[in-house]
C-alpha cells in the first residue's frame, strides 16, 4: 500500500498554463515529436500501453496534443551511446518539429546531431550551463531548454538519510555510470566532488563503483561486500534507471541499505529516495514542447529548476533489512510504502 503526504510538487503550479498566441502550428497541421529513449525497443502493444501511462504524453493530451490525431510521435531507442547516437541521427533525419528527452546526456547526444531542431529536456541532472548545453538559465540561447536538477544540496541530504537509518554507518558505496561515455565529464566530476565533500563532513568513507555496461552491476555489488560497505548511494542516469530493478534486487540479495534520487526506485523495493517527482517533471516538460509547437523559440524559454523535493521510504524493505526507522524520519516522508 502506498500512502502519500503532500504529494504535490511545486512544478505542478501553472502546468496548465495558457498556450501561446496565434503563432506556431497552422490549423490542421500534424505536429511531429521525437522521443529518444534508453533501453530496448518496445513492441506495438507496449507502446500502446505506454501511450496511456506516459506522464509526458498525458501532459501533451491535457494541452491539446493527442497521438494519432494531431500529433505523430517518433520513438527511437538505444542501450549504449553508439546505439543512441544512431537513433538520434535517425530522429533528426525525420525532421521532427521538436525533440523530447529525460536527461542531459540524451540532450547532448541530440545536440551533436542538430543545432536547429528544438530539444526539450525534462530532468537534466546537473548544470546545463557548465556542461556547455545552454548559454544561461534565463536565456538558453540555443536549441535546448527545459528543466534541470542541481545536486549540490541533494547528495549530502541522501547521505544524511543513510546515516539516520543505518546504525554506526561509516562505509558507503557510490554506484554510478561512466557518464564520460556520454561526453559529459563536467557533470561526472561535479557529482564526485559533491559526494566526497558530503562524505567527509559526515565522517563516512566513500568507495566509488563505476559501471560501463549492462552486466557489471552484480560485480559492483560483490565489490561492495568485499569492502564491507554498509550502504549504497546510487546515482541516477537513464542507463541506471533502465536497470533499476536489477539494482534493487541485488541490494536486497546482499541485504544492504540504499538511497536513490527518485521514488521510482523505491516503489519496486529500494529503501529510500530523496529528489524530484520525475513524472511531474515529464508533465512540465510537455508544457515546453507545447509552447515550442505554438511558436516559441527554445533559446527564449528560461530553464526551470524545481524547488520541491520528496522523501520516499519503503518500510517493507526496511523491515527485511532489520532497520528501525526513527519516528521523526517517518513523519517527514512524502511517500511511504508499507
Predicted regions and their residues:
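Short hydrophobic alpha-helices and adjacent helix-cap/hinge residues
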Residues: 1-338
Amino acid at each position: 500500500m502506498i500512502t502519500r503526504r503532500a504529494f504535490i510538487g511545486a512544478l505542478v503550479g501553472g502546468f496548465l498554463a495558457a498556450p501561446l498566441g496565434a503563432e506556431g502550428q497552422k490549423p490542421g497541421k500534424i505536429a511531429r515529436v521525437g522521443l529518444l529513449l534508453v533501453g530496448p525497443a518496445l513492441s506495438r502493444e507496449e507502446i500502446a500501453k505506454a501511450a496511456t501511462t506516459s506522464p509526458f504524453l498525458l501532459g501533451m493530451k491535457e494541452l491539446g496534443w493527442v497521438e494519432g490525431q494531431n500529433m505523430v510521435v517518433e520513438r527511437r531507442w538505444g542501450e549504449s551511446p553508439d546505439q543512441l547516437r544512431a537513433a538520434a541521427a535517425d530522429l533528426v533525419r525525420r525532421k521532427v518539429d521538436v525533440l523530447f528527452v529525460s536527461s542531459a546526456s540524451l540532450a547532448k547526444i541530440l545536440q551533436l546531431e542538430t543545432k536547429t531542431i528544438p530539444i526539450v529536456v525534462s530532468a537534466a541532472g546537473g548544470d546545463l550551463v557548465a556542461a556547455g548545453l545552454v548559454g544561461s538559465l534565463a536565456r538558453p540561447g540555443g536549441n535546448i531548454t527545459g528543466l534541470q536538477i542541481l545536486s549540490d544540496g541533494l547528495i549530502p541530504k541522501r547521505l544524511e538519510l543513510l546515516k539516520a537509518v543505518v546504525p554506526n554507518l561509516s562505509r558507503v558505496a557510490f554506484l554510478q555510470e561512466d557518464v564520460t561515455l556520454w561526453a559529459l565529464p563536467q557533470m561526472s566530476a561535479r557529482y564526485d566532488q559533491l559526494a566526497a565533500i558530503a562524505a567527509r563532513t559526515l565522517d563516512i568513507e566513500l568507495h566509488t563503483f563505476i559501471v560501463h555496461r549492462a552486466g557489471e552491476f552484480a560485480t559492483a555489488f560483490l565489490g561492495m561486500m568485499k569492502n564491507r560497505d554498509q550502504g549504497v548511494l546510487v546515482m541516477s542516469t537513464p542507463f541506471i534507471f533502465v536497470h533499476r530493478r536489477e539494482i534493487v534486487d541485488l541490494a536486497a540479495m546482499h541485504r544492504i541499505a540504499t538511497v536513490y534520487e527518485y521514488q521510482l526506485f523505491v516503489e519496486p523495493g529500494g529503501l529510500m529516495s530523496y529528489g524530484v517527482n520525475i513524472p511531474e517533471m515529464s508533465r512540465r516538460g510537455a508544457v515546453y514542447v507545447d509552447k515550442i509547437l505554438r511558436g516559441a523559440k527554445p533559446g527564449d524559454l528560461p530553464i526551470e529548476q524545481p524547488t520541491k523535493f520528496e522523501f520516499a521510504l519503503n518500510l517493507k524493505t526496511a523491515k527485511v533489512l532489520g532497520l528501525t526507522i526513527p519516528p521523526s524520519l517517518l513523519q517527514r516522508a512524502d511517500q511511504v510504502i508499507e
